[in-house]
From Swiss-Prot:
Name of the molecule in the record: ATP synthase gamma chain
Subcellular location: Cell inner membrane
Domain of life: Bacteria
GO cellular component: plasma membrane; proton-transporting ATP synthase complex
Gene Ontology molecular-function annotations: ATP binding; proton-transporting ATP synthase activity, rotational mechanism
Function comment: Produces ATP from ADP in the presence of a proton gradient across the membrane. The gamma chain is believed to be important in regulating ATPase activity and the flow of protons through the CF(0) complex.
Coiled coil: none
Family (UniProt): Belongs to the ATPase gamma chain family.
Pfam family, one: ATP-synt
CDD domains, sorted: F1-ATPase_gamma
A GO biological process held by the record: proton motive force-driven plasma membrane ATP synthesis
Membrane topology: Peripheral membrane protein
Amino acid sequence: MASLKDLRDRIASVKATQKITKAMQMVAAAKLHRAQEAVEAGRSYTQRMDALVTNISKDVDLVDAPLLMRGTGNDHVHLLVVCTAERGLCGAFNTQIARLAREHIQKLHAAGKTVKILTVGKKGADILLRDFKSLMIDHVDLRSVKKIGFAEAAKISKQLIDLFNEGAFDVCTLFYSRFVSVITQRPMALSLIPAGQNPVDEGQDFVDQAKSREVSQSAVYEYEPDVASLLNDLIPRHISVQIFQALLENVAGEMGAKMSAMDNASRNAGEMINKLTVTYNRQRQAQITTELIEIIAGAEAL
């Protein structure tokens, strides 16, 4: 049985931990509000960009389409871009994304495909390194970036396009977590290259793309100088926008998951403090009772 001193020390330790988890919860809540605003603002732009590319691509012959759109004609080498958080303490957020990527890798291997992995975020890299170290070709470290901006997405996009032009892969798929609510984040797999493809997994990429495409379906476009030249400029930006939106979704999802995790941790700490306090009071009461009995017994002996 723990001594009273041990119980006091343990109660103090749990209270200190609870203060930390509550502070982290408040910080995550503040960051979540800003991240959620960025996600909602970005979704509209991403929707329209996707609809624009989809509709313009209908007016160009496949042979005249940019290589990023028509692809290599093969699907043997797959590059998986797995985006996770740089830090932990956010529940199963990182694990869920890595699990979806792992399932996709297993399916590709079963189909005889070659798989390469590029990770964005330390936690996802740590998880996948355990089983797929030989498949890793690069890692993007964003720990020094205080606020995710379009510049970070553009750098990743340029790296992917350069690799594609060098013939490093045929198909590129982006893994991230779509922000649904504070307690719900949905792992997604989105086809990046060839551009204009459908999502790899069930559901829609970002927000109901079918609806956004339908809205712009009846639009009539005139192109200057020509549709192929326009797509050559538009497709790289489209890829950058998709990556940027995925990063924004990840930030919001991470903050939501962290807020929930820290709230649960604070509640658990509170329950533990109550239990330890009850145990401490009982032991203290028993000790006082024993001391009184000893004093009374000594007085009677006199």
